[in-house]
Amino acid sequence: MARQTQSEQLDRIVAGILVRPGTLVRPANNSVAALVRVALELRGLPRPDFKAGLRADLERRTTMATALGRAVNPIREGFHSITPYLILAGAPQWIEFAKQAFGAEERFRVQRPEGGPIMHAEVKIGDSIIELADANPQFPPSMAAMSLRVSDVDAVYDRAIEAGATPIHPPADQDYGCRDASVKDMCGNHWYIFTPLSANSIFEAWRSLTPYLHPLRAPQVIEFAKKAFGAEEVYRAQSPDGVVHHAQVRIGDSIVGMGEAHGPYQPMPCTLHLYVPDADATYERALRAGATSIQPVADQPYGDRSGGVQDPFGNRWFIATHMRDVAPQ
């Protein structure tokens, strides 16, 4: 009998595997044996986990296509691409402070019975919304910095101090085209209150609320935001020694400001609610850019599909796509 080539041996063994899947075959040649192991693995595909993942992905794509076909806005009504989210020790007291200091309007609250912790609340300040909740073991209290655009810096500064805030610096005209002041609220959050002094101010396009970061190194944060969220850098003021004193990036329809940590302005990792057209794709991009998962993407009872990540600098991003309108409960 003529000796079979390696190719002929492999063809014969693969044919046997297909006809009799349970057959144990021991080829004489080691190189053929390695290929047979691959053939045995492939014979078992698609595995159940592969099928389940494929089905879930197809269902998600179908749901999103249906939502897009109905012209559902991927951003929930009243929100922008980015909405700050405060995790507080004493959320009810903070809401009262925001009403007195900033003229805030409470839109929505989910609170445990008998004056228990606030699980979620939404407050409107000017043209923007800020979300908040009482801290819990999973999400302890954290402090954030926020720019607050107003029509009268001095009046808002005075009201904030009267409501219990601590001054950081009093109102003053600045050479970058603003009159500004800053305070710290009772929860430790910084508020940079400002009014543009001219139409050419670099802050002219800012809304009532804009999150402000104080990273140790701003360029790394900017590059992460570009890779993860498609951010566009729109402004950078950098000194000859490389310190970034102020920068702005645009994500969707929103701005995130930042200036590198110095003096009393130290890193304050924040929580941001980010609306995007495809939460799953953005979540995966963020992980590839270096973020770690907090919560996998899933459909939520309030009509969003969302998940969460933490970037390499400690900021938490809850990434969402609005899928359907749900009446508040």
Question: Model-found features: residue ranges?
Answer:
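Charged, compositionally biased N-terminal leader segments and the immediate start
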Residues: 1-21
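Short alpha-helical interface segments
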Residues: 14-46, 58-69
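N-terminal beta-strand motif that seeds the catalytic metal site of vicinal oxygen chelate
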Residues: 66-96, 107-108, 143-146, 194-223, ...
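Vicinal oxygen chelate
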Residues: 70-77, 81-90, 119-124, 135-206, 245, 250, ...
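Conserved acetyl-CoA-binding loop of GNAT-fold acetyltransferases
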Residues: 100-107, 165-166, 227-234, 290-292
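Conserved short beta-strand elements that form part of the metal-binding/catalytic scaffold
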Residues: 108-141, 190-195, 234-267, 316-321
